[in-house]
A protein has these predicted regions:
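Sec-dependent signal peptide recognition
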Residues: 3-12
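Hydrophobic h-region of N-terminal signal peptides that target proteins for export
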Residues: 12-21
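Proline-rich low-complexity regions
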Residues: 34, 144, 179, 296-297
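C-terminal domain-boundary segment and adjacent tail
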Residues: 62, 171, 229-306
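Short alpha-helix boundary/capping motifs
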Residues: 89-90, 119, 151, 190, ...
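Structural recognition of alpha->loop->beta junctions
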Residues: 91-96, 164-168, 281
Length: 306
């Protein structure tokens, strides 16, 4: 075994050893601020609608003092700059951290390295003044659609750019199709069904990744939940938080979750896909693929018609 292979094997061995009294932890992260996943109709994009959705979404997080990180794409909104600032201030008022999600939700599969870098920098022009006014930093970046680079050169170039600009990647372990349910929820004839089936679907995904964590990493570890800023999640957040508590979770900040050694595991996936880091680690180990539960076909159809 070469020295490099021995180091990798040692990392996997150390990561797989659970700590005494280990408990379940999850970091809540919410993408596509100010609103995403369900904003195809113009009425949902007004300041009043986005403010109401945001206040409902944040209320249980604020009341329960749950850390949350919101990822912003400032160029994907019709809000005037002062109104966008008001929405982002609502997040900061609730104790949230804000992260960079590129200017316009840029897809690294379809964007040159130079243009993608400009997307990141352009988003900073909006986000840095907002967070600095609160004494915070712009620490985290999340790849839109979890696309980290279709070829090795692109992946490496953007990772190096992010590091040079002081960003930490915000991976996802609890990946899911909440945005599809959110789209279905906007249709009056599907709203009740979407609300009824949403939490059972999410819990099935969480249960899958809990099991898969043990198979891939050797133990459960602090997970990172991906959600989107949507009307559905603003209505279902109390139930979603209760679901996690029922499963034995406590809520931690993104930075705290990332301190776990699991997030230092080798991850060498290169390609067009965007999926959970648990899948990426399993691929790096050469394990057979196992996919999380799919969203129902009717949800997929409804989202496609949006």
């Amino acid at each position: 075994m070469t020295g490099g292979m021995m180091r990798i094997a040692l990392i996997w061995l150390l990561v797989a050893v659970p700590g005494a009294g280990a408990d379940r932890q999850v970091a809540i992260t919410i993408d596509d601020l100010p609103r995403g996943g369900d904003s195809a109709d113009k009425a949902s994009r007004t300041f009043a609608e986005i403010r109401g959705m945001t206040e409902r979404l944040l209320a249980p997080l604020r009341q329960q003092q749950i850390p949350v990180t919101g990822f912003v794409h400032p160029g994907r909104t019709e809000l005037a700059a002062p109104d966008l600032r008001r929405i982002l201030d609502l997040w900061l008022d609730a104790g949230a951290d804000l992260g960079n999600h590129t200017w316009s939700h840029a897809d690294l599969n379809r964007t040159t390295v130079a243009d993608y870098e400009q997307e990141i920098l352009k988003a900073e022009t909006v986000l840095l003044p907002v967070v600095k006014a609160r004494g915070k930093q712009l620490e985290f970046f999340r790849y839109p659609m979890l696309h980290t680079g279709p070829v090795a050169e692109t992946k490496r170039a953007i990772a190096e750019f992010l590091a040079a600009h002081g960003y930490r990647n915000a991976p996802v372990t609890f990946d899911n199709s909440d945005y599809m349910f959110a789209a279905a929820y906007t249709r009056p004839e599907l709203r009740a069904r979407a609300a009824q089936e949403y939490l059972p679907y999410l819990e099935s995904v969480v249960a899958f990744f809990e099991r898969r964590s043990v198979e891939v990493v050797g133990r459960e570890f602090p997970q990172i939940m991906l959600m989107h800023a949507s009307e559905l999640n603003s209505r279902m957040m109390p139930d979603l938080l209760a679901m996690f508590r029922r499963r034995g979770y406590r809520f931690v900040a993104l930075g705290e979750a990332l301190q776990d050694a699991a997030y230092r595991l080798p991850e060498n996936y290169v390609g067009p896909g965007g999926f959970s880091w648990i899948h990426r680690w399993s691929m790096t180990k050469g394990m057979p693929n196992k996919g999380e539960p799919d969203e129902p076909e009717w949800v997929r159809t409804a989202a496609a018609k949006r």
